[in-house]
Amino acid sequence: KPNDKLKNDTEKLLKVKCSLYMITRALSQYNKLGDPDMQEFCRRQPDRIYQFQVEHDGQPDYIACYLRVKAGQSKSGHGVYTRRSPFVLFHFFSLDGALKVLGKECEFVEGVEKGYVETIGSPEYACYLNDYMAILQGMLT
């Protein structure tokens, strides 16, 4: 459904959760299926966690998933990765803000400016990952 047709928080939750789970899974598969640029991106990294979290009703990890990258290998997962701190954390402040950024109602940089999302950690690698997310989204449209 388009974002403006979502009637309640349950529908918003479902769309955001599915979107983030698909994004992290797609990023991992993009590496495993052999994209040369993504493989190089993963190969040159030690063990790193790219964490995605959506805050709702005061709960900072209401929705959470991650991409783990280590020496050319990648794995996606649900929840907060607890064995180490994230190398990059994409923190969305609300379901509505996450919907706007993930639904491309606003670009990621604009979402940061408007307070929908913040990135904590390496800005350079956050940009790299955002570029790969844009490539994957382009494949779907």
Regions found by a protein language model. Give the residues of each.
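Feature captures hydrophobic
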Residues: 1-141
